[in-house]
Amino acid sequence: MPAISFQSVSKVYPASGRPGSRPLQALEQISFDIEEGEFFGLLGPNGAGKTTLISILAGLARPTSGNVRVHGFDVGSDFAQARRYLGVVPQELVFDPFFTVREALVFQSGYFGLYHNDAWIDELLDGLGLADKAKANMRQ
């Protein structure tokens, strides 16, 4: 079973409603598998659909057609299970330089539905060797 599987995934964004606007075909019948342990790079010019593809994988957007599975779990119908296997790092992390390292992690984890996770943040800080920096401001 592949770690990630895209099967006939298409995404059409509706017309904006402005005069002359038309629907935008961002993805058309994309199919591929990524096996566990395999390295995979997603390259392409602006507007090629990379962000749309990742947004669908992360459950932030829904495909117009097709399905995406993560370790066999459908991202649309088994999102909670699929999400356990995913980690998405946004292109640009937004943080307040006056936050402590701990506060920044709490804030960012909230974007991904991870609330009340002090034990996990402690484990993360320890694992990264940053436990002594937890109370330091991000700008330091």
What are these regions (language model features)?
Residues 66-77, 81-82:
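Conserved ABC transporter NBD signature motif
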Residues 45-49:
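Walker A (P-loop) phosphate-binding loop of ABC-type ATPase nucleotide-binding domains
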Residues 106, 110-134:
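Conserved ABC ATPase "signature" region
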Residues 58:
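Helix-to-loop junction immediately C-terminal to a conserved catalytic motif
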Residues 40-42, 54:
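Short hydrophobic beta-strand immediately N-terminal to the Walker A/P-loop
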